[in-house]
Amino acid sequence: MVASISPYYGVSFLEFFLVFFSRLFSGKLFYDHLYIDDIQVIVFFAIAVSCSVVGTFLVLKKMAMYANVVSHTILFGLVCVCLFTHQLIHLSMQALTIAAVSTTLLTGASIHFIRNVFKVAEEASTALVFSLLFSASLLLLVFLTRNAHVGTELVIGNADALAKTDILPIFLVLLINLGISYCFFSSFVCVSFDTIFAFSLGIRIRLVDYLIMLLLSASIVGAFKAVGVLMSLAFLLIPGLIAKLIASSVQEMMVYSMVFGGLAALIAPALSRSILSIYGIGLSTSGLAVGLLLVFYVVMLVFVCSKRAIMLRQKLDK
């Protein structure tokens, strides 16, 4: 059954949530026709939670730079897959997975190879690999596709092109991330804080690093169509950075990360729809979500700094 008019048509910001939650609690989301707004909320929320799980460990391990490199260099693998499959937009999940995993492993191996063979600092080898692979991907994208629209979708995604079939893959990625993080939680935490102590306990540090790399690539694959390979970096890192400001334990940090990421995922589609309804302007849903995450970070940073300043002033007064 395909409805002619979306119940979200012409709604305001608050009305969007009234419509969505009424459809959710009435069960229509499970057996009725899913509209693009329903799909965007579901997919963005799953992406936010999935990326928040991995992002917590990336922030703790100070792998933000590596995540940045992978989110850019993975474009090289996607362009190569486009060339072999002759599919520029409708890539299969298998092709995306192969591209993401192979490029992630290639990036990590290249960084270690340059660092160990040429005896340069890890930051220098990371910057070199990033520059080479990302520039190569852009050159291939420009000279072989000559299609700016395709390039835009690869970079920032296209939330309006999401379909019902995109829900299952991202939930599979979410379950994989949650399952592996639960099984190896203590190892991830131990390696994140003290690699020497983790090694003394018999934890295989390299294996843990590769597991995190695989979770990272899986998260980027899940987020590719909705937010692109570059916007996914914000979903991976910003919620974790926000949570780190206020959390007192790793568990709290992961929960707060999911909360802030989930809030951005819920608000962005509603904000995009309301702006379209009121002003007739279509804005990128993924761009709005990233903008909201940045606003959350600035607000929490100001709040934490103000709280610390007040506490310091109270101590000085005593």
Swiss-Prot record:
The name under which this protein is listed is Probable metal transport system membrane protein CT_070
Highest rank taxon of the organism: Bacteria
Q: What does this protein do?
A: Part of an ATP-driven transport system CT_067/CT_068/CT_069/CT_070 for a metal.
Keywords (alphabetical) are: Cell inner membrane, Cell membrane, Membrane, Transmembrane, Transmembrane helix, Transport
Q: Which GO terms describe its biological process?
A: response to zinc ion; transmembrane transport
Q: Which family does it belong to?
A: Belongs to the ABC-3 integral membrane protein family.
Chain segments annotated as transmembrane: 1-21, 39-59, 64-84, 94-114, 124-144, 170-190, 196-216, 226-246, 252-272, 285-305
Record GO cellular component, one term: ATP-binding cassette (ABC) transporter complex
Q: What lineage does the source organism belong to?
A: Bacteria, Pseudomonadati, Chlamydiota, Chlamydiia, Chlamydiales
Mode of membrane association: Multi-pass membrane protein
Name where it's found.
Cell inner membrane
